[in-house]
C-alpha cells in the first residue's frame, strides 16, 4: 500500500467506526473468519463500555465460515450486558445462523428476502487415519452442540433438528418464522423500532 492508500484506509476505518458508535449497529457480511470475529468482539465490547443500557443491532448477511469464530461471536453476544437484536438481511447460513440464534427469540428479526441455511458442520480435513478419527470425533461434538442450540432456540424437537440438519436445510423468511428461528419479518427500520418499543 502507498502512503495515500494507508491514509484512505484509516479515514474509511474511522468513518466506519463512527457510524458503528452512532448507530450501535454491527454488520457481519461475507465469510466468518477469525479476523471478522476479533473485529466484532472489539466493536461489541466498545459499544457496551459506552452505554450498556442501550441495545445493539447485529445485521447478518453471511455464507458462514469458521465455526469456532462463529461460536466466539455467539458467546460475546450472550456475554455483554446490552440487549442484542439480530437481523437477517440476506443469506444467513451455517455459522452465521448460529450467530443469528445468539439473540433471544423476541430479539431476532428478518428482512423479507433473507434466506436461512442450517446444516451440519463441514470438514475439509485431511491427514493420517488417527488424526482424521480424532477430528471426526470433535466434529461430531460440535454437530451435537449446534443441534442442541438450534433445538433450544427454536423449540423444535432434537430429533427433527438432527434430521433437518443432516443435509442442507433452506428456509425463506416466512418459513424461518414458522420454524422458530425468526420472531418477526419486517420490511422497514420503522417496523423494527415499533416491535422493539412495544
UniProtKB/Swiss-Prot annotation:
Catalytic activity: Hydrolysis of proteins to small peptides in the presence of ATP and magnesium. alpha-casein is the usual test substrate. In the absence of ATP, only oligopeptides shorter than five residues are hydrolyzed (such as succinyl-Leu-Tyr-|-NHMec, and Leu-Tyr-Leu-|-Tyr-Trp, in which cleavage of the -Tyr-|-Leu- and -Tyr-|-Trp bonds also occurs)
PANTHER family in UniProt: ATP-DEPENDENT CLP PROTEASE PROTEOLYTIC SUBUNIT
UniProt gene name: clpP2
Cellular component per GO, a single term: endopeptidase Clp complex
HAMAP family assigned: ClpP
PROSITE patterns linked to this entry: CLP_PROTEASE_HIS (PS00382)
Family affiliation: Belongs to the peptidase S14 family.
Protein name, UniProt field: ATP-dependent Clp protease proteolytic subunit 2
GO MF term list: ATP-dependent peptidase activity; ATPase binding; serine-type endopeptidase activity
Assembly behavior: Fourteen ClpP subunits assemble into 2 heptameric rings which stack back to back to give a disk-like structure with a central cavity, resembling the structure of eukaryotic proteasomes.
Amino acid at each position: 500500500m502507498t502512503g495515500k492508500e494507508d491514509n484512505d484506509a484509516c479515514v474509511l476505518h474511522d468513518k466506519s467506526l463512527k457510524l458503528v458508535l452512532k448507530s450501535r449497529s454491527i454488520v457481519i457480511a461475507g465469510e466468518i473468519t477469525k479476523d471478522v470475529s476479533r473485529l466484532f468482539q472489539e466493536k461489541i465490547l466498545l459499544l457496551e463500555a459506552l452505554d450498556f443500557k442501550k441495545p445493539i443491532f447485529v445485521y447478518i448477511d453471511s455464507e458462514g465460515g469458521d465455526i469456532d469464530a462463529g461460536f466466539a461471536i455467539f458467546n460475546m453476544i450472550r456475554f455483554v450486558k446490552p440487549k442484542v437484536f439480530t437481523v437477517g438481511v440476506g443469506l444467513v447460513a451455517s455459522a452465521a445462523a448460529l450467530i443469528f440464534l445468539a439473540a433471544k427469540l423476541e430479539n431476532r428479526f428478518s428482512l423479507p428476502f433473507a434466506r436461512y441455511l442450517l446444516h451440519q458442520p463441514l470438514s475439509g480435513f485431511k491427514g493420517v487415519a488417527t488424526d482424521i478419527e480424532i477430528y471426526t470425533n470433535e466434529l461430531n461434538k460440535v454437530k451435537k452442540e449446534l443441534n442442541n442450540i438450534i433445538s433450544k432456540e427454536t423449540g423444535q424437537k432434537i430429533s427433527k433438528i438432527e434430521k433437518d440438519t443432516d443435509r442442507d436445510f433452506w428456509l425463506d423468511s416466512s418459513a424461518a418464522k414458522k420454524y422458530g428461528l425468526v420472531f418477526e419479518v419486517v420490511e422497514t427500520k420503522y417496523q423494527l423500532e415499533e416491535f422493539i418499543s412495544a
